[in-house]
Curated annotation (Swiss-Prot):
<comment type="function">
    <text>One of the early assembly proteins it binds 23S rRNA. One of the proteins that surrounds the polypeptide exit tunnel on the outside of the ribosome. Forms the main docking site for trigger factor binding to the ribosome.</text>
</comment>
<keyword id="KW-0689">Ribosomal protein</keyword>
<dbReference type="InterPro" id="IPR012678">
    <property type="entry name" value="Ribosomal_uL23/eL15/eS24_sf"/>
</dbReference>
<dbReference type="Pfam" id="PF00276">
    <property type="entry name" value="Ribosomal_L23"/>
</dbReference>
<keyword id="KW-0699">rRNA-binding</keyword>
<dbReference type="GO" id="GO:0003735">
    <property type="term" value="F:structural constituent of ribosome"/>
</dbReference>
<dbReference type="GO" id="GO:1990904">
    <property type="term" value="C:ribonucleoprotein complex"/>
</dbReference>
<comment type="similarity">
    <text>Belongs to the universal ribosomal protein uL23 family.</text>
</comment>
<dbReference type="GO" id="GO:0019843">
    <property type="term" value="F:rRNA binding"/>
</dbReference>
<keyword id="KW-0687">Ribonucleoprotein</keyword>
<keyword id="KW-0694">RNA-binding</keyword>
<dbReference type="GO" id="GO:0006412">
    <property type="term" value="P:translation"/>
</dbReference>
<dbReference type="InterPro" id="IPR012677">
    <property type="entry name" value="Nucleotide-bd_a/b_plait_sf"/>
</dbReference>
<protein>
    <recommendedName>
        <fullName>Large ribosomal subunit protein uL23</fullName>
    </recommendedName>
</protein>
<comment type="subunit">
    <text>Part of the 50S ribosomal subunit. Contacts protein L29, and trigger factor when it is bound to the ribosome.</text>
</comment>
<dbReference type="GO" id="GO:0005840">
    <property type="term" value="C:ribosome"/>
</dbReference>
<dbReference type="InterPro" id="IPR013025">
    <property type="entry name" value="Ribosomal_uL23-like"/>
</dbReference>
Length: 95
């Protein structure tokens, strides 16, 4: 089994994710190879909360140019985690 800290890379704090936090849904950037069950277990172990549902999205890298050089931003996977009513992740509070 993978270490939960290897699965959950970092929280994704944007205006849209803060609106979702009001609905008890929290957004994280996760390992590209992690599945929903691994993400659920990692969140429950790290934050001591109960997860009801996990939605995942693979975000493609965007094309970027610097002068004549063309490259891409990295691809990543994000997970939107819905918690049981009454549970909170304090990391997102007060941002």
């Amino acid at each position: 089994m993978k270490n939960p800290r290897d699965i959950i890379i970092r929280p994704l704090i944007t205006e849209k994710s803060m609106d979702l936090a009001q609905e008890n849904k929290y957004t994280f950037i996760v390992d590209k190879n992690a599945n929903k069950i691994e993400i659920k277990n990692a969140i429950e172990e790290l934050f001591k909360v109960k997860v009801e549902k996990v939605n995942t999205i693979r975000v493609k890298g965007k094309m970027k140019r610097v002068g004549r050089f063309v490259g891409r931003t990295p691809e990543y996977k994000k997970a939107i985690v819905k918690l049981r009513a009454g549970d909170k992740i304090e990391l997102f509070e007060g941002v």
